[in-house]
Amino acid sequence: MFIQRTFLKVLTLLSIVTVLVHGQTQPKDKITLKAVIYDQHKFYNPNFQPKNEGEFVLTKGIVKSDIDQEKRIPVLNSMDANDSINKKARISWPDGFKYFFVDNQAGDSKSAKSGKNLPIQRDIELNWNGEAYEYSNSNYFPINGQGFNDVSYPVPRGYVPISGESWTSMSTSTSLKGNNYNFCLKLNSKFTYNGNEVFKFTGDDDVWVYINNKLVVDIGGIHSQVSASVDVTKLGLTVGTIYNFDFFYCERKTSESNIKIQTTIETYCAYVDYCGVCEGDGSTCCNPATTCNDGKRCTNDFCPDPKSPLAGKDISKYCDHIPVKTCSSKDTLCKQYTCSDDLKGDMCVIKNTVTCPGNQTNCEASGYCDDKFGCINPSKCTDYIGQCFSGKCVNGECAKVTADDCEKIIGGVCRSDYVCEPGLGCKSSERCRQGSDICDLVTCDPKATDESKRCITTVLTDEECRCCEYDTLRFCEQAACSNKTGLCQPIPKNVDDGNLCTIDACNEDEKTITHVQVTCGGCETCSYATGKCEPDSSLCNDNNICTIDICVHEGILDGLPQGNCSNTPVDCGANDEDKCKTWSCDPTKGGCQSTPVVCEDKGKCLVGTCQPSTGQCEYSDRVCDNGGAFCVIGQCDQRLGCLVFDRVCSSDNSRCEEGVCVNGTESEEGHCKSVKYDPLPFNCNTGAVVSTAVIAGSTVAGAVALGIFLYGGKKGYDYWKDSRNISMGSSNSNPLYEEQQTGRGVNPMYDDPAAN
């Protein structure tokens, strides 16, 4: 009886102390897995509730050993329905596997094999059983009466049940009718590795567990209850490091649904999405096609960032509506397109068409628009070349060729009287002309440095001068004497106009002197310097800064030298050593333009950058900013990009100590430390029996004193007060016990009636 009374007193004392020190750190009694369940139906996904043909057995190797990090879901090893593993696992529709763990509530509700599913958020609580956190349920039907199992769900017309089944009941057993057997469960979470974790699962059907993105539990297929476990300490993980923990479970066939989870892994959520799902993508309660549909085809509708604090709010008010870029991709230099929300017409319609009327200030003629080069406007002035216009534009007018221009073009020290004659071009006459006295022979000295001595007059002798006096000269002749005979020997009249591009001739019959311009074909003109047809690129000017305009000699056509215009694109950036620029030419923006090469990121966590020396894209891990705080983790997730969440520290002894994060200061770096739970759990005490120190540590003296006073009376209180400075580290330092010579401990607060 004494032992019973003493035990009851101690238990009661422990209870009071626990209440009085409420709020001090305690080891977790339970952990909550915030999962999402995807309700399935065989009408939409024939991988569920397959026919009772052949064996239903455990099947390994259905999924790949690496998780899809962008979606955080398993991936089938084979997409072949005839693959031996798929057949054994009853995966008759491999394409439907992608809907096991991904939202497809927008799937066609009227069509078979649409993959439609209904996501439902569910929590699973694992309680501490003294050795591990555990959840066990041999009748696991978490969504009975919900989803497709809801009697109000509209049954598709195409659904034909087999004997004994109905839309909401797949079991033919009376006792099991109404249970929702077809569903899949997904949990994406994290944990900080302590160095001693284990995980064990028992149940049916498919179960896959990934740790650090690697498959560690593989009990796939439709089968009866089986078990599998993993010793996390054998996975090569680093203590104190954060890893992904991903759990996938499917119930695909009647008539059992068993689940038992035992683990020492303390999972947590880096974030909870606005649907309440641990590290979810928001799809449980937000569908871009329905929740965010603004009814406009010219916008792409997106759900908000799943990390947004929108729980309990109208999510549709926070959707993103991004204008589509489909139409702008059709733009050219001549046409710009825009998107039309008018469902009756084309989606992309022309917003603007470029016209090319020509700029009068630049003497441009009306032109046309080229999709590659933009406006092509020929110069009006090129039409008048050869008609005493220079081909240049000055103040909006085509400039005429002046005498000074002609002097520059065909000038020489022995020519003068420059003039431009339409149809012929520049002309000139001899500077030193013959006078009326034929006996005075006038010549020009091109080497003379004194202009007054440029023209030289030589007086002929009477014989030389008058030898042709009595001869009759023809129109196209001029007098001249033979040096050999001294007799009259007329020579052709000099009709040279000084222009090599004219054919000078004297017509005796018509008594005329003509100067016919040399004819050239295409874009060739006669060169004043050579008198030959040569390519003239000025005739090819299209007034477009983005083309190189040149005339190319093509040969002889119809007896004439022929040139053709070539307007090739400007080679922008040809000498630019920076290969991370893309060059283009836009006449509306002043010509050559450069834009940086964009290296698209690979997924959400690899950042692309261009290397200027090679122009090649290189990729590096995305750095997520944690603000420099040690106790904040910045980590990239392939699905969602950067996540920022509190660091969860490991401890040296997870059942007796808590990992506490300490941010860095100027004098101390941030670090994790282990702090003993207060009160310390019973099994963490090193003594043989529970002590007062174990009950409440060194911070609850007042609470202990009150408890001892209540249950030990004044004698007990006085005894405690006298000994309160004694360190209590074991059972025999507990003031509730007193060491006797017999070696037995007695309670000094117990009044033995026999002693009174």
From Swiss-Prot:
Compositionally biased region (Polar residues): 730-744
Transmembrane segments: 693-713
Domain PA14: 126-281
Signal peptide interval: 1-23
Classification via InterPro entries: Fibro_Slime, PA14/GLEYA, PA14_dom, Prespore-cell_inducing_factor
Record keyword Signal present: yes
Glycan attachment positions: N82, N359, N483, N564, N663
Compartments, record wording: Membrane
Region span, Disordered: 730-756
Regions of this protein lying in the Cytoplasmic compartment: 714-756
Membrane topology of this protein: Single-pass type I membrane protein
Extracellular side: 24-692
Superkingdom of origin organism: Eukaryota
Family the entry assigns: Belongs to the prespore-cell-inducing factor family.
Name of this protein: Protein psiP
Organism: Dictyostelium discoideum (Social amoeba)
Gene name of the record: psiP
